[in-house]
Amino acid sequence: MAQLFHPSSNTIAKAIIVGGVLGVPTLIGVGYAVNMSYGYQVFKPIEQPVQFSHKHHNMDDGIDCRYCHTAVEKSTSAGIPDTHTCMSCHSQIWSDSPELAPVKASYVSGQPINWNRVHDLPDFVYFNHSLHINKGVGCESCHGRIDQAPLAMKVHTFSMQWCLDCHRHPEKFLRPKEAVWTMGWKAGDAGINPDTGKKYTQIELGTKLVKEYKIGHERYLTDCYTCHH
């Protein structure tokens, strides 16, 4: 009987089967990631009464995060500056801009601006900004390159799984306290590891900082009570 199919057909058939087996989980994984990002409103700019640009103020003008977020090193909340802080500059700069009309009105009336929350954690989750800052967690680790953001938005899901990834392996994320505010920081910026004679890797430096900053054991960091109380 004459051969109906070319010998290469077997290879093609196997490739289709393997592609189907591997492709379906891949599609499911991609779909799950997209759904998670959408559900958690990741990369979605939030409309505000005043379109404040972190990029303009931080990257372009070099204003330190703590000039506006004054409580971040000692309070559970980073804090939103009142309009007195805004007007300390804008009474002299861009004072006639229509964009600043709500800021000026708030300053005169004493009524705060009703900003729309960007990072809205569930009511039953406890998060302490000062604790993370003082343990070497950089702003960038949670807020991404906020210095490059014309409009504020979430860049991570802030899901429990996302938090646990850090709590289980803090050495992957820690940096020296003085570098907490430095955007684009890399472990190699910390200098030479005397044990290797080479620039620090993140794991080398992070492991050192876990001990130096007395970071709790994974068992404590992943205990329900640590964040839910």
Question: Language-model segments: which ranges?
Answer:
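Hydrophobic membrane-insertion alpha-helices, especially the h-region
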Residues: 14-32
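Sequence context surrounding c-type heme c attachment/ligation sites in exported
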Residues: 46-99, 128-229
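Extended active-site neighborhood of metal-dependent phosphoesterases/phosphodiesterases
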Residues: 99-102, 114
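Aromatic-capped interface at the extracytoplasmic side
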Residues: 28-46
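Amphipathic alpha-helical "stem/stalk" segments
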Residues: 104-107, 135
